[in-house]
C-alpha cells in the first residue's frame, strides 16, 4: 500500500479514513513524503500543524517513509524511464542539479528523523542521472518499474508500480497499490475500502519482500515494459480519436 504526495496541506480527512481501515488489519503503508512541497495543486486543505510529528508516529507504527522528490515542481519536459507524460522534477536535468535537489530533500527528512533510503519519483519520472545521484546519496530502493515482481538493477532495488487501481488478487504479481488522497473520488474510495476489507490478508510490507534476479526476472521486465508502453499508446490514441470524433460531430451539427 502506497500513498503519494504526502504534505502538510493534503486531504487529511480522506487519508485518515483509509489509514483507519489499514491499521484495523495491521497493514503497514509506504508514505511518499514531499520534503518541501511547493506544488500548490497538492495544497487542498488546512495545514497540519503537527505534520512531522504525525509522520514520526506513523513511522513508529511501522509505516515506511519514502522521499517523494524535493519540491514536487515539474520544471523539466522530460518523461524519463517510466513517466507517462513529459513533466518531471528530475529527468532531463544535469546530474549535479539532481544531486542538489535530492540532497536538500534528504537533509529535511534527516533533520526530522524521518529519512530512509527509499525514493519515490514524482510523476514516476527519473533518468540515469537520477539513479546515479540516488546511489551517491545512499539510497538503495526505487519505488517504480515495469515488472510483475521486484528486481535489482545497477545496485538498486526496484519495486514495481503497475496500476493505481486495485488489481485482481489472482494475478501472479506483486505491485504497489497507489493512492492519491487529494483526487480519489467517493466511488473510488468506497471501492478501495471494500478491496482492503476483503483482501487484507494479501497485503505485505517492504520488510517482507524477497527480491531475486534470474532469467525469468529479465523476461518479466521486458514483457511488462512492452505491454505497458502498448497500453499507454493505445490510451493516447483512443483519447485522440475521441477528441477528433467530438470535434467533427460539433462541426456537422
Q: Where does each model-flagged region fall?
A:
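Hydrophobic faces of well-ordered beta-strands that scaffold small-molecule active sites
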Residues: 1-3, 29-31, 65-68, 117-119, ...
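Active-site beta-loop-alpha junctions enriched in small/polar residues
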Residues: 6, 34-38, 70-72, 146-147, ...
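Acidic-and-aromatic substrate-binding clefts and catalytic sites of carbohydrate-active enzymes
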Residues: 6-14, 35-51, 77, 95-96, ...
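C-terminal domain-boundary segment and adjacent tail
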Residues: 26-33, 142, 183-253
